[in-house]
Amino acid sequence: MKAQTKSKKVNKAWLHDHVNDTYVKLAQKEGYRARAAYKLKEIDEQLGLIKPGHVVVDLGSSPGAWSQYVRRRLSPDGAAVGQLNGVIIALDILPMEPIEGVTFLQGDFREEEVLAGLQEAVQARPVDVVVSDMAPNLSGVESVDAVRIAHLIELAVDFAVHHLKPEGALVVKLFHGSGYSQLVQLFKDTFRVVKPMKPKASRDKSSETFLVGMGLKRQG
């Protein structure tokens, strides 16, 4: 009974914070599906990653807030329905409501067949930016979760190495904790410029952070 009472208090506190969250209100006002859009928006505004004409791949895209933001960046009319100057390919294991101009593939990025489908959708076009909001189902066991998180990020890095333009960029979500320093080193080994970032829209209580890699190093 005590555990249930504590759980109810936690859920009530989370709901209160969520309803009163500045970015939740802003997302509703500006038509974004989730407050996460403002994390990518801040990163992009600081670094100038996404530009009209770009080919962008969005990994872990559902519910679609990041793809919505990218679409607005690639459209002369912003959020309005109409012309799109660029290509957006989104992928998630979960379903995603359609977004005009976004090619969506549903599947598990860890499976070779799904990865092959993504590569086919890219059609050998050099990719300008890969953004990844992928996260595994967390078990609560840090050592287990660290391995799952690292695996997804390693797959994203491998995809970027094979598909990014030499001057392209990769943005990934990760969490401070076990394995963090190794993932930062992986980025440093792969990219010429590496920037850890904690956008304002990322909750203070969360260990969530983002790594941005820009400009591929020569491999081999």
From Swiss-Prot:
Name of one Pfam family that matches: FtsJ
Entry annotated with the keyword Transcription: no
SUPFAM superfamilies linked to this entry: S-adenosyl-L-methionine-dependent methyltransferases
Recorded catalytic activity of this chain's protein: uridine(2552) in 23S rRNA + S-adenosyl-L-methionine = 2'-O-methyluridine(2552) in 23S rRNA + S-adenosyl-L-homocysteine + H(+)
Residues the entry annotates as binding S-adenosyl-L-methionine: G64, W66, D92, D108, D133
Localization per Swiss-Prot or TrEMBL: Cytoplasm
Transmembrane segments: none
Active site: K173 (proton acceptor)
GO molecular function, one term: rRNA (uridine-2'-O-)-methyltransferase activity
Key word Cell inner membrane present: no
HAMAP family reported for this sequence: RNA_methyltr_E (MF_01547)
Family assignment from sequence similarity: Belongs to the class I-like SAM-binding methyltransferase superfamily. RNA methyltransferase RlmE family.
Alphabetized PANTHER family for the sequence: RIBOSOMAL RNA METHYLTRANSFERASE, RRNA METHYLTRANSFERASE 2, MITOCHONDRIAL
Record function comment: Specifically methylates the uridine in position 2552 of 23S rRNA at the 2'-O position of the ribose in the fully assembled 50S ribosomal subunit.
The protein, known as: Ribosomal RNA large subunit methyltransferase E
Organism of derivation: Acidovorax sp. (strain JS42)
